[in-house]
């Protein structure tokens, strides 16, 4: 079934007219857009169309506001407040002349001093020594290594160098004590090492060995052996052995003496004191 299109000629004209009204309302605030359009057409001398039907109405149009007045001329300004001389134009001229020349009074001198002080504050002082460009690696190394660093420690002996020196001195003393210990052990193998307590600061005492007599008479085994010999001699004096018994007794005595000698050698070997190679000192701050 055929239907007429929606956008016919009348609908298109209505859309065009509504667009004109909306554009006029966005630009201007007068109530009659048609009269405004006719006025513009007469001013701009555009081709005019026949006037629309109906009475003509001349409505007032809005105009732009006037610009503000120009500022006053520079010659009409007030005189310089710090000018000397009479008031008015003559005083202003005299004040300008005095200001351009020498200072007129103490106030002007103070003002000039303040300006000079401000200028000196604006100046950047030059660095001493004057910096120079580094052109090679050798120059960079020489400049960085020649710089001296001040010691930031207020208490003497608390810096890293002083603490390292104290540790090194302590280790040297410990090594010296170990050396003397081994030397004494090599000289007297049968001695017993004794260590002294750490001395006070300023006094140095070395470890010493107490010599022990190597004679078998002072040892307990030597004493028992001497007692046995004395008992055997008393028994020999009491008895009067026969030749056969004397030979057997001699053989027995020889075997017994050989056994006693072997036992004495074993006892001597066993009585040897083993000297430890470990240090026998107590580390202390020197």
UniProtKB/Swiss-Prot annotation:
Modifications the protein undergoes after translation, according to the UniProt entry: Phosphorylated at C-terminal serines.
Composition bias type Basic residues, residue spans: 222-241
Low complexity: compositionally biased ranges: 242-265
One Pfam family from the record: TT_ORF2-like
Protein name in UniProt: Probable protein VP2
Superkingdom of origin organism: Viruses
Ranges for region Disordered: 67-108, 184-286
Keywords: Phosphoprotein
Keyword Transmembrane helix carried by entry: no
InterPro entries: DUF755 (IPR008474), HEV_TT_vir_Orf2/Gyrovir_Vp2_N (IPR004118)
């Amino acid at each position: 079934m055929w239907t007429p299109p929606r956008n016919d000629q009348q609908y298109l004209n209505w859309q065009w007219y509504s667009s004109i009204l909306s554009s006029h309302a966005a630009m201007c605030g007068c109530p009659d857009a048609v009269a405004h359009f006719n006025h513009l057409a007469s001013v701009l001398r555009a081709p005019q169309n026949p006037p629309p039907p109906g009475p003509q109405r001349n409505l007032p149009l809005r105009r732009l506001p006037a610009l503000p007045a120009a500022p006053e001329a520079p010659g009409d300004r007030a005189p310089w407040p710090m000018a000397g001389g009479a008031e008015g134009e003559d005083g202003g001229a005299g004040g300008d002349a005095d200001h351009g020349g020498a200072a007129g009074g103490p106030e002007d001198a103070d003002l000039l001093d303040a300006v000079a002080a401000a200028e000196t504050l604006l100046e950047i002082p030059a660095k001493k020594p004057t910096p120079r460009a580094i052109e090679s690696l050798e120059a960079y190394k020489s400049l960085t290594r020649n710089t001296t660093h001040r010691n930031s420690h207020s208490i003497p002996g608390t810096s890293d160098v002083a603490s390292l020196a104290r540790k090194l001195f302590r280790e040297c003393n410990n090594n010296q004590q170990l050396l003397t210990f081994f030397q004494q052990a090599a000289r007297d193998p049968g001695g017993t090492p004794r260590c002294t307590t750490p001395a006070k600061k300023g006094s140095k005492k070395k470890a010493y060995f107490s010599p022990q007599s190597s004679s078998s008479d002072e040892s307990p085994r030597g004493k028992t052996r001497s007692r046995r010999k004395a008992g055997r001699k008393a028994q020999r004096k009491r008895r009067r052995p026969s030749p056969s018994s004397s030979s057997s007794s001699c053989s027995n005595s020889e075997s017994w003496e050989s056994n006693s000698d072997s036992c004495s050698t074993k006892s001597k070997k066993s009585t040897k004191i083993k000297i430890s190679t470990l240090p026998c000192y107590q580390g202390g701050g020197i």
